[in-house]
């Protein structure tokens, strides 16, 4: 769950919750995750063109901890699609910091990640996986996990998050 302090920081626009708490908040409120991420609705197909993308469509998430750094910048590829159950993102992953303990997250749903650039390290349960450019992983997000760039590298990934409604 979320602490009262975390909820107050979110309500006060001091912190933007990480993905796991955001999914939990959506479930408690009975709304889909996309409700928090979009402000328009399109019933038909949604096309996202590179020439129209900008940084105002991005969200920086920390991972479950209000004190954690925001190591991932999410660029939504579907923010105008109403009623969606999948959340596709292009994600810029900042280099890992030495000595940082990663806070594992867990939430309902599934995630698919495809590495476009760089090297990614994924802690999943008790296992660690290294993914390089062209590699992918599909996993149940109810298992504790953390996604970060390996060593001092940056990475760019395509991530698709499915959350049941």
Residue ranges, per PLM feature:
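Recognition helix of helix-turn-helix/homeodomain-like DNA-binding domains
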Residues: 2-18
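DNA major-groove recognition helix of helix-turn-helix/homeodomain DNA-binding modules
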Residues: 20-35, 41
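Solvent-exposed, charged amphipathic helical/linker segments at domain boundaries
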Residues: 38-65
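A short glycine-rich, His/Asp/Glu-containing loop-to-beta-strand
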Residues: 56-102, 160, 164-165
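Ligand-binding loop in jelly-roll beta-barrel domains
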Residues: 70-73, 132-133, 141-165
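Short acidic-glycine-tyrosine-enriched beta hairpin
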Residues: 77, 125-141
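Short, conserved beta-strand element in jelly-roll/cupin
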Residues: 90-94, 105-122
